Design a protein with these regions (language model features):
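Membrane-embedded alpha-helical segments and adjacent helix-loop junctions characteristic
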Residues: 37, 51, 55-157, 311-312, ...
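Transmembrane alpha-helix interface/packing and boundary motifs in multi-pass membrane proteins
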Residues: 40-48, 125-135, 171-182, 269-275, ...
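Juxtamembrane and boundary regions of transmembrane helices in multi-pass small-molecule transporters
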Residues: 1-17, 136-139, 157-161, 168-250, ...
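Juxtamembrane helix-boundary/capping and inter-helix hinge elements in multi-pass membrane proteins
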Residues: 63-66, 96-100, 109-113, 150-164, ...
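Structural signature of hydrophobic alpha-helical transmembrane segments
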Residues: 18-33, 77-89, 139, 216-218, ...
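Hydrophobic alpha-helical transmembrane segments in multi-pass integral membrane proteins
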Residues: 266-269, 318-337, 390, 394, ...
């Protein structure tokens, strides 16, 4: 414990007390010291990730790494932060109404007694259920119990290959369906805000994000699903006597109808943003307001404030504040210039530059399990470096999101995964092996399919 506490303090002091390098302002050095401390805290998980965020905000203010406290609290003033609160509230309402579990049960019924069809439908549900239930953690919490019922009915042991395949996919691939949607939870929310800020572009609309990210993440989901199937293919034959599962759901209730109508109306507003021009945060906040209205909605204020998961709010706001401090202090530009000098020989070879960037992103992800910390660190660096070397910074930002969010290297590295791996008794070496496979898949898909596709939709690698 002493090491985990002492290391971030030592890193902070080492950066802030070092001689000021050429081109880096005093304020930039202080901002870099706070970011370095936050990165180590996120990587070691010495503090809860939300507490790390708040420590960083306080540190930015106390050591004058920003001009004033309003700059330190930049992330708390951004619409994207409240967009996240809105979609989490919508997900909570759908979950508590019972609608999400009913949808999952109906999907499983279609598989009958065929484990291969069950597996394929589960992969499809990772994408389909995201429209009603954005949080991968909540989806996993619902689906794991439903699929455990199926395994129990079929007489499949926890350590059997079929159960491991189902749970490995649920732990390692489930969240890929979320990131394809702007409303898919903390990863797309943080990533889209950072890329828009650093790219100097308008905030991503729901449809623009879907156009750019659905192809890479759905392809990674498909290929990742194939890898899991091949790893455990011996289990996709049912024991003798196993048959169709009949999951009881009961009659549909009024609260489920309400949840479905609210989710459908919100989705329609997101789908039609090209017509009305509303920020994605507005439909999310409308849904949140309806859900909390007495007599009309689905949640009381007490239920909302108790179950919202406020850590997500503080993590995203503090991540945006840290990234903004790096920008306005000049630290991000200095860091990028330093990296440019080390890869100057690759100038004129944009594909090789992005390949090196992707490899570096995978290594950063391996030592930084917290996705918000990873994004807050890697997106500013990747976009600034790419821009300095003549690459499209938006593509660089999107690329490191694809690489970083496609992998899980440790059982405890993602909230959506840890409890699933534990229940299925999946060992750490199996997760590491899957993480390596997913890294290769993500990079391969990115360079063979996604880059040409992005160029077709207006985001080429070189501007």
């Amino acid at each position: 414990m002493a090491f985990r506490v002492g290391l971030p303090i030592a890193v902070f002091l080492a950066v802030i007390l070092a001689p000021n390098p050429d081109g880096l302002t005093d304020q930039g050095q202080r901002a870099l010291a706070v970011m370095a401390m936050a990165v180590v805290l996120w990587a070691t998980e010495t503090l809860h990730m939300a507490v790390t965020g708040m420590v960083s905000i306080v540190a930015l203010t106390l050591i004058n790494a920003v001009d004033d406290v309003s700059v330190a609290l930049y992330g708390f003033s951004q619409p994207v932060t409240y967009f996240l609160v809105g979609i989490l509230t919508l997900g909570m309402a759908v979950h508590r109404s019972g609608l999400a579990e009913r949808m999952a049960a109906h999907l499983i019924r279609f598989a009958g007694g065929n484990p291969k069809l069950l597996y394929v439908q589960m992969l499809a549900a990772f994408a389909g259920l995201t429209f009603a239930l954005p949080s991968a953690s909540t989806r996993g919490a619902i689906m794991v119990h439903v699929y455990e019922q199926v395994m129990e009915h079929w007489g499949v042991e926890k350590t059997a290959p079929l159960n491991k395949a189902i749970m490995m996919a649920m732990g390692g691939l489930n969240r890929l369906g979320s990131t394809a949607l702007l409303a898919g939870g903390i990863t797309p929310v943080v990533a889209s805000a950072l890329i828009a800020d650093f790219g100097g572009i308008d905030a991503f609309s729901w449809t623009r994000w879907f156009i750019l990210m659905a192809v890479p993440f759905y392809l990674v989901l498909i290929f990742g699903g194939l890898v899991v199937y091949l790893m455990f293919r011996s289990g996709f034959t049912l024991p003798p006597g196993a048959g169709t599962v009949d999951l009881k759901t009961g009659p549909i209730q009024t609260k489920e109808i309400k949840a479905g109508l609210i989710a459908l109306g919100t989705a329609l507003l997101w789908f039609t943003d090209f017509a009305h021009g509303l920020s994605p945060a507005v439909p999310a906040l409308i849904a949140m307001t309806i859900i909390l209205l007495p007599g009309v909605g689905l949640l009381t204020w007490r239920e909302f404030e108790t179950n919202m998961g406020w850590a997500n709010f503080f993590v995203i706001a503090s991540s945006l504040s840290l990234a903004n401090a790096l920008i306005i202090s000049g630290a991000a530009a200095w860091f990028a210039d330093t990296l440019v000098g080390s890869v100057e020989g690759l100038r004129g070879h944009p594909t090789l530059i992005l390949l090196a960037m992707s490899g570096a992103a995978a290594m950063v992800r391996a030592v930084m399990p917290n996705i918000s910390g990873y994004l807050a660190f890697i997106i500013p660096v990747a976009m600034s470096t790419g821009s300095a070397l003549g690459l499209n910074p938006v593509v660089c930002g999107l690329a490191v999101v694809v690489v970083g969010d496609s992998v899980v290297y440790y059982p405890a590295s993602a909230t959506a995964s840890v409890f699933i791996y534990q229940r299925a008794e999946i060992r750490a070496p199996e997760v590491v092996r899957m993480g390596i496979f997913m890294t290769v898949i993500a990079v391969g898909v990115l360079f063979t399919i996604v880059l040409p596709y992005w160029s077709m939709v207006g985001e080429s690698l070189t501007p």
